[in-house]
Curated annotation (Swiss-Prot):
This is Sophorolipid acetyltransferase. Residues 1-20 are annotated as: Disordered. The keyword Transmembrane helix does not apply. The gene is at. Coiled coil: none annotated. Pfam families: Hexapep (PF00132), Mac (PF12464). Disruption phenotype: Produces purely unacetylated sophorolipids. Yields mainly lactonic SLs, in addition to minor amounts of acidic SLs. Its EC number is 2.3.1.-. Keywords: Acyltransferase, Repeat, Transferase. It comes from Starmerella bombicola (Yeast). The lineage of its organism: Eukaryota, Fungi, Dikarya, Ascomycota, Saccharomycotina. Catalyzes the optional acetylation of acidic sophorolipids (SLs) at the 6' and/or 6'' carbon atom of the sophorose head group to produce acetylated acidic SLs in sophorolipid biosynthesis. Has no activity toward lactonic sophorolipids, confirmimg that acetylation must precede lactonization. InterPro entries: Hexapep (IPR001451), Hexapep_transf_CS (IPR018357), Hexapeptide_acetyltransf (IPR051159), Mac_dom (IPR024688), Trimer_LpxA-like_sf (IPR011004). The record marks 129 as: Transition state stabilizer.
């Protein structure tokens, strides 16, 4: 899916759309669960100014905050593998109930925070470390095999730079898309409308405000391309590959077999 970031080529900033993005609305209805079915939601995911204080949105945000609070406070009842695994499974159930779309294997290290949850889509083997924040007024779409470092923030909601327009409480949101096999380092901020290409790496501390090409390393404030990543011949790769499982993938039989 190609995400329309609604970027202004003149100032490399963001501008709100004036019309509903039917492609995005159709994608959201088809792929995301528990989304509002009203016009305000269609504006929100389209980059059109919307009402963030819509009663339905506020109710859903409150319900999501309760789920996230439960996730962040679940603890193992005892120091046994079975008890730990039960806690992992419960957390994954909460994640799958909170996010709009998930694959089988998804894991976040508590705590994390999110606005709504229903606008988040994560691929297979998604992992995020401590204190990741998802401001998902517009969709945040992750591919497979994505790793997110601690204290990283994904921001889709934004405001006009004009103080007069901000005084009128104008707010709109632009989607973020992260491709497959992407590593996002610690303390990164990804801004509205950004697409991060497959196989790329975002260096720690970067502020990403423009699209990232596939197989590149970007870093800095604002982020810029530091290097291009050449394709590697699997037969010539150096070092021994270490195979391991995420906690939710493990069971009693695999616990002592995998590192």
């Amino acid at each position: 899916m190609v995400v329309n970031s609604s970027k202004d080529p003149q100032n490399k900033g963001m501008t709100p759309r004036k019309e509903i993005d039917q492609e995005m609305v159709s994608w959201a209805k088809k792929n995301l669960k528990n989304t509002p079915g009203n016009e305000n939601y269609e504006k929100m995911v389209s980059g059109v100014p919307y009402n963030p204080y819509d009663p339905d949105l506020m109710f859903r945000a409150l319900a999501t905050s309760e789920k996230v609070r439960e996730f962040n406070t679940i603890a193992s009842e005892s120091r046994t593998f079975e008890s730990n695994h039960a806690a992992y499974i419960k957390k994954v159930e909460i994640l799958k109930d909170t996010f709009g779309q998930t694959k089988d294997i998804v894991w976040l290290t508590a705590p994390f925070s999110v606005d709504f949850g229903f606008n988040i889509s994560v691929g297979e083997h998604f992992y995020a470390n401590f204190n990741v924040c998802f401001l998902d007024s517009a969709p945040i779409i992750f591919g497979d095999e994505v790793i997110v470092g601690p204290n990283t923030t994904f921001v889709t909601a934004t405001h006009p730079i004009s103080p007069e327009k901000r005084a009128r409480r104008i707010v709109y949101a632009l989607p973020i898309k992260v491709g497959n096999n992407v590593w996002i380092g610690a303390n990164v901020t990804v801004l509205p409308g950004v697409t991060i290409g497959d196989g790329s790496t975002i260096a720690a501390g970067a502020v990403v405000r423009e699209d990232v090409p596939p197989r590149t390393v970007v870093g800095g404030v604002p982020a810029r391309i530091l290097k291009h990543i050449p394709e590697e011949d699997p037969d010539e790769a150096e070092g021994e590959e270490l195979e391991f499982l995420l906690p939710v993938e493990m069971n009693v039989n695999t616990a002592n077999q995998k590192v």
